[in-house]
Amino acid sequence: MPFGTLYTRPFNPRSLAILAIAKANNLPLKIKTITSFKDATEEYLQLNPLGKIPTFVGADGYVLTESIAIALYDSNTTLLGTTGQEYASIIRWMAFGITEILPALGGWFNPLIGRANFNADNIYQSKDDTLARLKILDNHLCGREYLVGETLSLADLFVLGIVQGAFRFFLDKRWRDEHRNLSTWFERVHALPIVVDVAGPPVLAEYEMPIQPPK
């Protein structure tokens, strides 16, 4: 019997950690695809009135929205740190990913694929904002293998899902060579079987996706 149902779509940055944790904990998840909030059915809007993803519905009918909450519910104690400070730091980096990196990255990427209006000035600003936030991660990871503590935590899996699109479409070899702390961390965490099983092998950009209107 499934642990529950996860409403999401392929390559959704907010869902990778949820899927990886479920895989690691042998929690079978039924996946239902929601391609866009514009296509959300009335049934789905009853679960999540904003029509956003992901949304989790447990086998017992328990409904949970917001990716951080779902990831925490899905997780086990081994991924949540060993002290109160580590737990707080894990939440900190998850929040940093979802509130700081993802909106900036979306402002860079979405106009290039027609998902948002194309305004070059705004896109360049979003690019600068994204790279500044990734620099914070790169600096933090100096001398560290993981974001929090000495072992893998939920923060690593969650932030990996947030930044994988940047590595796939924008962060070319030159950038990766100049930011080895973050790049090495990305390669290390993405190589984990629980990640590869749900996301496939990493795809690394050969060149930065150009800022030009979508064709």
Curated annotation (Swiss-Prot):
Binding site for glutathione: K52, E66
Domain GST N-terminal, residue spans: 2-82
Keyword NAD: no
Disulfide bonding pattern of the chain: none
Residue span(s) of domain GST C-terminal: 83-211
Alphabetized UniProt keyword annotations: Transferase
CDD domains according to UniProt: GST_C_EF1Bgamma_like (cd03181), GST_N_EF1Bgamma (cd03044)
GO molecular function term, any single one: transferase activity
Residues that coordinate or bind substrate: K52
InterPro entries: EF-GSTs, Glutathione-S-Trfase_C-like, Glutathione-S-Trfase_C_sf, Glutathione_S-Trfase, Glutathione_S-Trfase_N, GST_C, Thioredoxin-like_sf
Record's signal peptide: none
Transmembrane annotation, as ranges: none
GO CC annotations on file: cytoplasm; nucleus
The protein's Enzyme Commission number: 2.5.1.-
Pathway recorded for this protein: Mycotoxin biosynthesis; sterigmatocystin biosynthesis
Cofactor requirements of the protein: glutathione
GO BP terms in the entry: sterigmatocystin biosynthetic process
Induction (UniProt): The genes forming the sterigmatocystin biosynthesis cluster are co-regulated and induced on oatmeal porridge or the fungal isolates were grown either on oatmeal porridge or in YEC medium (0.2% yeast extract, 5.0% corn steep liquor). Expression is positively regulated by the cluster-specific transcription factor aflR that binds the palindromic sequence 5'-TCG(N5)CGA-3'found in the promoter.
Similarity section: Belongs to the GST superfamily.
Role played: Glutathione S-transferase; part of the gene cluster that mediates the biosynthesis of sterigmatocystin (ST), a polyketide-derived furanocoumarin which is part of the most toxic and carcinogenic compounds among the known mycotoxins. The first step in the biosynthesis of sterigmatocystin is the production of hexanoate by the fatty acid synthase (FAS) units stcJ and stcK. The polyketide backbone is assembled by the non-reducing polyketide synthase stcA by condensation of the starter hexanoyl-CoA and 7 malonyl-CoA extender units followed by cyclization and release of norsolorinic acid.
Protein name, entry field: Glutathione S-transferase stcT
Taxonomic source organism: Emericella nidulans (strain FGSC A4 / ATCC 38163 / CBS 112.46 / NRRL 194 / M139)
Gene designation: stcT
